[in-house]
């Protein structure tokens, strides 16, 4: 049996007076599992906040066709918003394992021990350069293009989502618990800068979320969202 033990979520704009282009789906029961997600509207194109909302709404209706159906809906927007685009990273956890859908640069992590293991790959110019072994990670720190997205739910680029499955035995810790974190780039930027908290903080969803939020709020660089969830497998 799959039991939701704890969850912590937030979704804030970079500045209180501006629109938040992120949307989240806190954990929701869906058939025999739980569904949750983060969508980050792409900056630079008008209507990012509309596109991310469309993605979350379509995910709740039909996860299997969320990418194609969201694009269909975005194409129906008025001319003013014809370039509206969004990323989307979602998780659907059942007793069998984790189904992941991903496009863009939000990130999904699994906690193993006291470390977070990134399970999604960024669809960015930087990641492409890494994949092609043109630069090392260290060299790329000095290069522009970290936030240039190569695919999204968008009419402006070819849509190439990743969809994959991780068996439950690769997710569970020694207590038969599963910890999953989805972050928009405005959140994981601050986690990756210093990817550690105390052991006590790493063992608690609420403490982790509060500690990361405190770190971000000192100098946010973008809208920032987190969906952090803990499950027990009986």
Residue spans of the language-model regions?
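PP2C/PPM-type serine/threonine phosphatase catalytic domain
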Residues: 1-234
